[in-house]
């Protein structure tokens, strides 16, 4: 293993990406409050005044995914006809799923229902059964097939250019060649890649900003240590080094094996909470109701902007999530494209949407309803039995991270389960951010053939950049401006993703015409 060998770095993309990120990070450290005020104003404008554009964009992505599954191009293979998949189906599913979760899924999966319980959407009454069902359903909706459809469409566009058109460049800009032509090789293409990379780095700090306090709280609960900023910095540093060493082993030996371990550990923790956490019947029954609520109200939940009631609920939650997924979509698309050679378009889209959604739903169903079951048993003992904990009281008085930790610790064998949960949170962040660092390195690589990976020092470098920026911004309480910047970047990035989709359909139609309609079933 030689970390310093591998494909050459494209300095025209690499250097500006690093420079812009570091410049803005320093600016946010120097002016955290002023930066946040200005960026928040822009963010509010984009979610309140332009939020409807995110709504229509995500629905268009969902419709495109359905077309790719059901339409005439579904059997088209991503690669040559003789190509076999590079990874087993189990490993492929695990690598897709763990790439997008990180610790954010553990965080929101356990606690998001509280926000919707306290401020119900769609006009439901606070504390009512409708509020409870919507509280459980909305998290699953936000992390469900709409988001994964967006990832899938972008991945197919990139994979087609990479595996079918045989362009040895794994970048977002390359997927726009069908529309932009040779301009992709000039400043326009470089700008697309640099812009996407910056937005992604901001999105990663959002995940670290959520996961670090949660993991630190878990360590403190287990060890009795005081929750301090120093301990949080140690957590981020350990994360960063683990991500870097995983990347040094490459895609097959490092990322795949870590993803497999993550899957086994996740289902171990989730399985214990489901079957032995004391709320089995409540979890399965309430999950069933939540799934029904989603399917019954999918169009309402998707299109609701609350223009009359003006609660801002769709803007603060649904639009925010759609913007977050837009920021992550290119990275997920590049990653899924890289690992999907030899699979058909239908397999890739259906696999991403179905298994990704199912995995996310399992986390929300078990973690969220376990937490809700604890709360209902504590506040309504005449109707609910089992382990009890006033989770909302802890949420209000101690904080979100401690509400999550105490919910896990309230299960039987609480210390053991919490230790497993902390390990799961750690590994989930490692697998998620490893994927991001791998993607950033791929985009900065001048030429990346199908059988190649980015130089390992390149991937390791981006892991260090992500960790160093997170530590620096945490020290100076400047994480939020960079996080907000990434969401602001989502609006123009939507335009790029539209170009990507249009370019793909243009290329595949032209190839189909040349082959005399070979894409027909």
What are these regions, as identified by a protein language model?
Residues 108-122, 166, 274-297, 357-399:
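Extracellular/periplasmic helix-exit of transmembrane alpha-helices
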Residues 1-131, 248, 271, 490, ...:
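N-terminal alpha-helical transmembrane segments of multi-pass membrane transport
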Residues 1-6, 32-46, 65-86, 135-142, ...:
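Membrane-water interface regions at transmembrane-helix termini and the short interhelical loops
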Residues 5-29, 62-66, 101-105, 139-213, ...:
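Helix-loop-helix module between adjacent transmembrane segments
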Residues 1-4, 37-43, 70-89, 114-137, ...:
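Flexible loop linkers connecting adjacent transmembrane helices
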Residues 6-21, 181-190, 227-244, 248, ...:
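Loop-to-transmembrane helix boundary motifs in multi-pass membrane proteins
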Residues 1-8, 169-185, 211-234, 266-269, ...:
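Helix-loop-helix connectors at the membrane interface of multi-pass transporters/channels
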Residues 16, 50, 57, 192, ...:
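Membrane-interface loop-to-helix entry segments
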